[in-house]
Amino acid sequence: MIVGIGVDIVELDRMARSMKQPRFLKRLLTDAEYELSQQYPLPRQIEFVSGRFAAKEAYAKAIGTGIAHGLSWRHIEILPDETGRPVMTAPFVGKIHVSISHSQTYAIAQVILEEEGHHVSS
């Protein structure tokens, strides 16, 4: 059974400006996400970081707390599986579905949370 849905959209230009702040990436990304982001050239890096930001915001909306009350950006990790599909690890007992997409202007993400034992087919 679905217990939460969250969606977020991010302007790539706004994220590019935020990324100029020295500690921004270290606050937003886990160590593994940060290492992966550093492998990309700058235009792709902005898309990557924007997608992660949108997905983490979408998760916070789906869980219902926002980034507060003991939940930080670094509690949520999104890494690609062997096929490149994003896989989210976060404090939730159940299945987390995440989808990330971007254009030249925006990144968007959707997160769906399912109760343990009540999964829809992926």
Swiss-Prot record:
It is found in: Cytoplasm. It catalyses: apo-[ACP] + CoA = holo-[ACP] + adenosine 3',5'-bisphosphate + H(+). GO terms for molecular function: holo-[acyl-carrier-protein] synthase activity; magnesium ion binding. GO terms for biological process: fatty acid biosynthetic process. It is an enzyme of class 2 (transferase). InterPro entries: 4-PPantetheinyl_Trfase_dom (IPR008278), 4-PPantetheinyl_Trfase_dom_sf (IPR037143), ACPS (IPR002582), Ppantetheine-prot_Trfase_dom (IPR004568). Mg(2+) binds at residues 8, 57. Keywords: Cytoplasm, Fatty acid biosynthesis, Fatty acid metabolism, Lipid biosynthesis, Lipid metabolism, Magnesium, Metal-binding, Transferase. Its main location: cytoplasm. Its EC number is 2.7.8.7. One of its GO terms (cellular component) is cytoplasm. Transfers the 4'-phosphopantetheine moiety from coenzyme A to a Ser of acyl-carrier-protein. Belongs to the P-Pant transferase superfamily. AcpS family. This is Holo-[acyl-carrier-protein] synthase.
